[in-house]
């Protein structure tokens, strides 16, 4: 082969290699996250997912890590999971949570499961989305007490998180926006819908006579002649919460210590109103009420059976103040038996929701 031909072939080979590098080597990997397939039990309705934060495998797993990540706190000792523990349905078994500075809050931690269906978050409803809710604890002086700027700096120099955020959100710089988006994605997967009640409702198991009696009491009003627990107005199935706000007669006007919803609306009509908590997994979420005043379900039932305290904002549904629900000892035991059917063991022990660092 002549020198000229060899030179031409050599040049063509160089051009070919360069073209391959242009198309295959220099082009960055295409952002292609894996859609997360959300499994919702048939007893629960469909879930609305924000268009700007779709669920992905990468985002959910990152959110799980961040939920358990103590780097999000000022001294590196607390995470979201410190006050939202899986064994107690992602709430705190203590009456009040204690922040990194040793300061206690004044409200009991709410559960973090099935919260994707709730239009507002916190006892006073001050957050309108899971993303908005997740912004607060990190900077709260009685909670994790850090700054988002400091958290971002820690995550950006971390050995793993920059790559994980790149895969989840296609970002080169980590900031609070994508941290809370990831946490919110994980929290949307915290779905509890496989309790004994769910299985009974689907026709898979049978209730005992006592549980059926409790279910009946749960769903009827007290009359002048018969007992009724009257729970269903605020705690109706399938969520066992109405997601709204009520003053359930815990205190009279002179003893209100927490203004509740009033802090958000500044309406006198909303004083001492708090968000209705779900009764799902209620057996393991003690203590109860916004201030954790009741240590047991028995105490909660006694409060309602007593009838509660009157006040200027007490809910009209608390219509038996003074004479209560007329529940007999047997009725109370039946109601408690039903409430225990709302416990979802599969959810409470699901390894997909556990600490990934253990």
Protein language model annotation of sequence segments:
Residues 1-18:
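Sec-dependent bacterial lipoprotein signal peptides
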